[in-house]
Amino acid sequence: MQQSTFEKIYEVVKQIPYGQVATYGQIAALAGNKRWARVVGYALHANPDPDNIPCYRVVNKEGRVSDAFAFGGGNKQIELLKEEGVEFINGYVDMKKYQWERPIY
Protein backbone atom coordinates (compact mmCIF):
# COMPACT_ATOMS: atom_id res chain seq x y z
CA MET A 1 0.00 0.00 0.00
CA GLN A 2 1.35 3.41 -0.92
CA GLN A 3 1.38 6.08 1.77
CA SER A 4 -0.51 9.28 1.10
CA THR A 5 1.35 12.58 1.20
CA PHE A 6 -0.30 13.47 4.52
CA GLU A 7 0.70 10.09 6.00
CA LYS A 8 4.33 10.67 4.96
CA ILE A 9 4.21 14.10 6.62
CA TYR A 10 2.70 12.69 9.82
CA GLU A 11 5.39 10.00 10.00
CA VAL A 12 8.12 12.67 9.88
CA VAL A 13 6.37 14.94 12.42
CA LYS A 14 6.13 12.00 14.85
CA GLN A 15 9.95 11.83 14.82
CA ILE A 16 10.55 15.40 16.04
CA PRO A 17 12.08 14.96 19.50
CA TYR A 18 10.57 16.36 22.68
CA GLY A 19 11.85 19.89 23.25
CA GLN A 20 12.77 20.49 19.61
CA VAL A 21 11.10 22.02 16.56
CA ALA A 22 11.27 21.58 12.79
CA THR A 23 10.31 23.88 9.95
CA TYR A 24 7.59 23.31 7.37
CA GLY A 25 10.28 23.09 4.68
CA GLN A 26 12.33 20.63 6.70
CA ILE A 27 9.30 18.36 7.16
CA ALA A 28 8.47 18.68 3.45
CA ALA A 29 11.98 17.62 2.40
CA LEU A 30 12.06 14.70 4.83
CA ALA A 31 8.61 13.58 3.62
CA GLY A 32 9.88 13.45 0.06
CA ASN A 33 9.46 16.81 -1.66
CA LYS A 34 11.04 20.08 -0.54
CA ARG A 35 8.25 21.96 -2.34
CA TRP A 36 5.56 20.56 -0.03
CA ALA A 37 5.98 23.19 2.73
CA ARG A 38 2.46 24.55 2.16
CA VAL A 39 1.09 21.00 1.99
CA VAL A 40 2.70 20.35 5.39
CA GLY A 41 0.62 23.22 6.74
CA TYR A 42 -2.55 21.73 5.28
CA ALA A 43 -1.71 18.30 6.69
CA LEU A 44 -1.04 19.66 10.17
CA HIS A 45 -4.27 21.64 10.13
CA ALA A 46 -6.10 18.37 9.37
CA ASN A 47 -4.11 16.37 11.96
CA PRO A 48 -6.30 13.34 12.79
CA ASP A 49 -4.36 12.42 15.95
CA PRO A 50 -2.90 15.44 17.78
CA ASP A 51 -2.05 13.31 20.83
CA ASN A 52 0.42 11.26 18.77
CA ILE A 53 1.34 13.66 15.94
CA PRO A 54 2.96 16.69 17.68
CA CYS A 55 2.16 19.29 15.03
CA TYR A 56 2.84 22.08 17.53
CA ARG A 57 6.56 21.29 17.09
CA VAL A 58 6.45 22.64 13.51
CA VAL A 59 7.23 26.34 13.03
CA ASN A 60 8.22 28.55 10.11
CA LYS A 61 11.88 28.97 9.12
CA GLU A 62 12.25 32.05 11.33
CA GLY A 63 10.89 30.14 14.34
CA ARG A 64 7.48 31.78 14.37
CA VAL A 65 4.44 29.79 15.46
CA SER A 66 1.26 29.64 13.42
CA ASP A 67 -1.49 32.13 14.21
CA ALA A 68 -3.81 29.56 12.65
CA PHE A 69 -2.65 26.69 14.89
CA ALA A 70 -5.61 24.33 14.59
CA PHE A 71 -5.61 23.22 18.20
CA GLY A 72 -5.94 26.48 20.11
CA GLY A 73 -4.17 29.21 18.13
CA GLY A 74 -0.61 30.52 18.31
CA ASN A 75 -0.72 31.12 22.06
CA LYS A 76 -1.55 27.44 22.67
CA GLN A 77 1.33 26.39 20.40
CA ILE A 78 3.72 28.62 22.37
CA GLU A 79 2.38 27.21 25.64
CA LEU A 80 2.93 23.60 24.48
CA LEU A 81 6.47 24.33 23.31
CA LYS A 82 7.37 26.18 26.53
CA GLU A 83 6.09 23.18 28.51
CA GLU A 84 8.80 21.18 26.69
CA GLY A 85 11.47 23.73 27.60
CA VAL A 86 11.64 25.49 24.21
CA GLU A 87 12.72 29.11 24.66
CA PHE A 88 11.52 32.10 22.67
CA ILE A 89 13.36 35.31 21.78
CA ASN A 90 11.02 38.22 20.99
CA GLY A 91 8.22 35.77 20.20
CA TYR A 92 10.32 33.46 17.99
CA VAL A 93 11.75 30.03 18.80
CA ASP A 94 15.52 30.15 19.24
CA MET A 95 16.17 28.05 16.12
CA LYS A 96 19.92 27.79 16.69
CA LYS A 97 19.22 26.04 19.97
CA TYR A 98 15.99 24.10 19.34
CA GLN A 99 15.82 23.16 15.65
CA TRP A 100 15.86 19.42 15.08
CA GLU A 101 19.13 18.43 13.44
CA ARG A 102 17.78 15.51 11.43
CA PRO A 103 19.75 15.20 8.19
CA ILE A 104 17.82 15.50 4.94
CA TYR A 105 18.75 12.80 2.43
Language-model features, listed with the residues they occupy:
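Nucleic acid-binding interface residues in structured DNA/RNA-binding domains
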Residues: 1-105
